[in-house]
Amino acid sequence: MSFNHQEIEKKWQAYWEENKTFRTPDETDKPKFYALDMFPYPSGAGLHVGHPEGYTATDILSRMKRMQGYNVLHPMGWDAFGLPAEQYALDTGNSPAEFTEKNINTFRNQIKSLGFSYDWDREVNTTDPNYYKWTQWIFLKLFEKGLAYVDEIPVNWCPALGTVLANEEVIDGKSERGGHPVERRPMKQWMLKITAYADRLLEDLDELDWPESLKDMQRNWIGRSEGAEVHFNIDGTDKKFTIFTTRPDTLFGATYCVLAPEHALVAEITTEDQKGAVEAYIDVVKSKSDLERTELAKEKTGVFTGAYAINPVNGEKLPIWIADYVLASYGTGAVMAVPAHDERDYEFAKTFDLPMKEVVKGGDITKEAYTADGEHIDSAFLNGLNKEEAIAKMIEWLEVTGAGNQKVTYRLRDWLFSRQRYWGEPIPIIHWEDGTMTAVKEEELPLVLPKTDNIRPSGTGESPLANIDEWVNVVDPETGKKGRRETNTMPQWAGSCWYYLRYIDPNNNEALVDPEKAKQWLPVDIYIGGAEHAVLHLLYARFWHKVLYDIGVVPTKEPFQQLFNQGMILGENNEKMSKSKGNVVNPDDIVASHGADTLRLYEMFMGPLDASIAWSENGLDGARRFLDRVWRLFVQENGELSEKITDAPNKELEKAYHQTVKKVTEDYEELHFNTAISQMMMFINDAYKAETLPKEYVEGFVKLLAPVAPHIAEELWSKLGYNETITYASWPTFDESKLVEDEVEIVVQVMGKVRAKLKMKKDASKEEMEQLALEEVKEQIEGKTVRKVIVVPGKLVNIVAN
């Protein structure tokens, strides 16, 4: 007999909604637990089976913690600004707001059909003006602190999309969306000074309970380097440029210098003879993305400018080249090249037949660059020193002579914060005709995104907002001065940087979050989501959180105490699920055919939560069969409780039950859901063999199952005679003493050969062991004389007989 999942799931979902079962009260003396999911972008495709994997994991924890007496905050919302809605609007002429609202309604219904225990009264939507009022407020605070500024920088301009793209949105020189060509062009952009927080973003990682691999990704992205800046004069001019190097000890080995093609000095120093070649080269570089110029570049390219730099340490003339592997946006946009001791410089020197000069002993520079430590040679006052000593000595020399200084740099760049799109938060800034700019007053927030039918890109590089005259043009009521609103909008990252704070206090019109509530709920106890957000989203959210900490809005330095990346659910053929491959599994179909509880159980049982695993219909059927077995064990054909269930204890199930409570509880805490489910399956096997089932064990088992399969658990709970939801029933406990084996297996040997194995009491005496063993091997020793019996208590009896 099978249970009717459609009936049961609808019934309990209606009950939870009606009774607001999962509403989180703020005032409580219970300890808190804040479980956060990465909120989804509500795409037109709807929910896919990858979403519920992480959501089920946090839901299991949330449901267990409620039963353990915690006040649990487990919310859901929508990261709803962004390119796809705008692209849809461009393609169809419909409004992105309507498209987004329709998608959100679909997502909400799908998520509710899976039985997650969210407090829907706290739902947030990044496109709601009452929400983005506070996104804009945070921007004003960044602006006040000097952390938001305008800069002219080379950006990835995509003419077809009419917008600037972030580096992540450019793949092989083409836009990720649509595969359109992308070129580099300088434009005025809003930047956020995340580099001002680089050290803190790095150091505070140590205090977090995050996977080490993820912390390393953040560390590498921030990329702290210690070294020196060195100033090079340009021969025959009064101009100079500065380079940064982590190996100032190799300055005597420099044989040429390289500037980024965009470097401001290039046009000024290039000689007449080289002008044509330099301009042609710069033209080619324009269309390449940073990634193509550096990591993806197969061969080194470059051109000599005709100019020379003077090495400050020995006065030698070094030819100045330009090459695309040096980026204007990275470091100083200039490098000194030491081909004997740097692999990239070595390749470049080999390609263009440039000289090399060995200054550190230990390698063979005819074969490759030598980058390890060694004794310095041909380096005047550094001769005989090792790397560490030579670096310190050279920095001292640079500082005394004024030729340079000690310096720490970061790979991290400031955050490009403007988008030339319509569907984003307006940036609350006004540019006046006299060249000044001011922030919109706080009391005038939210600066609402105007409705418009014309959201085509302006084509000038400005956003479609530039087309809406009545919105863009403003007049200062006090001075009559004319101005224009900022037409760039914020990136999709903005709204997702702080949403976890708004869940704490979603309806507050006076503040982003009430400080008392922030103190109560922060930091987030566990944050679960996909690894694709391991760097940027988490880095940006940590940056904003630290700014809010500095201005007293939040009480903690870090937002997320524990973080976990779920794996990916692949198609049955082990490929990534995608519409084009036709291997996407729709959760709605599974909920209809197998039930939400089955889907939840299956996704948790597939394997470790962080592994990427292929979807399997067989596995799904197996998960349903297990739930059917549970149902049949506890419920008769007529829907009544099984007659096996009794108030009397059952010694034979005692150990299995206490073991199950212990293992499932510990595994849930550790996010080892697959092994917890395995343990529950073993218990059900034992329970089928038992004559009777103590009601206490049945109730305990149903509570353990509830976080994974809440609908069937609620139904069983009501059949066990309870009128209230299982949500706040107390979590089962185990007794350590019941886990101890009171019987042991004894090996019986005759003349050293194993003849029998016996179960006996753990604390049996030597005499009892000997007596039982002799009884057991009576036949084997018949007609023989027992010479000696060796007894090892609790382990072995060896009989010597001949």
Swiss-Prot record:
GO CC, one annotated term: cytosol
Pfam families: Anticodon_1, tRNA-synt_1, tRNA-synt_1_2, tRNA-synt_1g
GO biological process: leucyl-tRNA aminoacylation
Top EC class of this enzyme: ligase
Chain segments annotated as coiled-coil in the UniProt record: none
Gene3D superfamilies in UniProt: 3.10.20.590, HUPs, Isoleucyl-tRNA Synthetase, Domain 1
Annotated EC: 6.1.1.4
GO molecular function, one term: ATP binding
Catalysed reactions, as listed in the record: tRNA(Leu) + L-leucine + ATP = L-leucyl-tRNA(Leu) + AMP + diphosphate
InterPro entries cross-referenced by the UniProt entry: aa-tRNA-synth_I_CS, aa-tRNA-synth_Ia, Leu-tRNA-ligase, Leu_tRNA-synth_edit, M/V/L/I-tRNA-synth_anticd-bd, Methionyl/Leucyl_tRNA_Synth, Rossmann-like_a/b/a_fold, tRNAsynth_Ia_anticodon-bd
Binding site for ATP: 579
Residue ranges annotated as motif 'KMSKS' region: 576-580
NCBIfam families linked: leuS_bact
Keywords, comma-separated and alphabetical: Aminoacyl-tRNA synthetase, ATP-binding, Cytoplasm, Ligase, Nucleotide-binding, Protein biosynthesis
UniProt subcellular location: Cytoplasm
Major localisation: cytoplasm
Entry protein name: Leucine--tRNA ligase
PANTHER family: LEUCINE--TRNA LIGASE, MITOCHONDRIAL, LEUCYL-TRNA SYNTHETASE
Domain of life: Bacteria
HAMAP family per record: Leu_tRNA_synth_B
Family to which the UniProt record says this protein belongs: Belongs to the class-I aminoacyl-tRNA synthetase family.
Motif ('HIGH' region): 40-51
